[in-house]
Design a protein with these regions (language model features):
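Conserved ABC ATPase "signature" region
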Residues: 63, 67-90
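Conserved ABC transporter NBD signature motif
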Residues: 23-34, 39
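Catalytic Walker B motif of ABC-type/P-loop ATPase nucleotide-binding domains
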Residues: 119-122
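Short, charged/small-residue-rich alpha-helical element at the C-terminal edge
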Residues: 192-266, 273
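Conserved ABC ATPase signature
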Residues: 94-98
Length: 273
């Protein structure tokens, strides 16, 4: 969702940080208000800000978080989490000695310290460079393999496209769609057929005007957009009409709409309602 859409507010409500003004939310059949301890123990939260005890060691930071949830000390589990996040060799270092990327890993370790089944990552790559962002994507992918359900908020479309199984779009405090990523691309994505020509043309022939074509780079290609949901895309007729118009084809290629185009379309439609 865009900035100010309500992503962090929604997460804060689910995690029990902000009290909802109305409605009901349950986590694994436990009400977040009536069963606060039960729901909170099932959730790990990695906030946007680096909230860490700078003068403590990595190991003590993570162990302390486990105790906050009433869990007994378990050095072996903490060791497992730190190794999983490539932090074990830094367990005795103070937080002030770590890079920004490693500090974010410590935040994830703290969120996993009490063995939650759901992990919220609130814009974990906001404000970081491209290299660190891709490093965090790898961490998320590795965590997913362990069976933890991960809910990640982001306004980087490429991030959702790279690592998400399901995508939800929130705008003006409303969750306007939740869909499997592949299904979302299939249902809402348009495709573009690019017809590459053997020779440059000055303009699109009048007999092709009904197809709403656009000229491509260097006036040597024609672009045709069509809806995947339609039974008839019109491609067969288009190619025949191109041939009849005297244009000579060199190549054909298609391009699928990406999540960014779908996201912009959804938000625009929602704002107009």
């Amino acid at each position: 969702g865009p900035n100010g859409a309500g992503k962090t507010t929604l997460i804060s409500i689910v995690c029990g940080i902000v009290k909802p003004s109305s409605g009901k939310i349950s986590v694994e059949n436990f009400d977040i208000i009536k069963d606060y301890r039960e729901t909170r123990s099932r959730i790990g939260l990695v906030p946007q800000e680096l909230t860490l005890e700078q003068f403590e060691t990595v190991f003590n930071n993570v162990s302390y978080s486990r105790g906050l949830y009433g869990k007994k000390p378990d050095p072996l589990y903490i060791e497992k989490v730190l190794k999983q996040l490539s932090l074990w060799d830094k367990k005795d270092l103070g937080l002030r000695q770590l890079s920004g990327g490693m500090k974010r890993r410590v935040l994830i370790a703290k969120a996993l310290s009490h063995e939650p089944s759901i992990l919220f990552l609130d814009e974990p790559t906001a404000g970081v460079d491209v290299e660190l962002r891709k490093e965090m994507w790898k961490v998320v992918e590795d965590l997913r393999e362990t069976g933890v359900t991960i809910i990640l908020t982001t306004h980087y479309i490429e991030e959702a496209e790279a690592i998400a199984d399901r995508v939800g779009v929130i705008n003006q405090g409303e969750l306007i769609i939740v869909e499997q990523k592949k299904e979302l691309l299939k249902k809402m994505g348009n495709k573009t057929l690019t017809v590459e020509l053997q020779e440059e043309i000055a303009k699109i022939p009048d007999e092709l005007s009904k197809y709403n074509l656009t000229l491509g780079d260097n006036n040597t290609s024609l672009n045709y957009k069509y809806d995947l949901r339609e039974k008839r895309t019109g491609i067969t007729n288009l190619l025949q009409d191109i041939k009849d118009s005297g244009l000579k084809l060199r190549d054909l290629k298609t391009e699928q709409s990406n999540l960014e185009k779908i996201f912009v379309s959804l938000v625009k439609e929602n704002n107009e309602v």
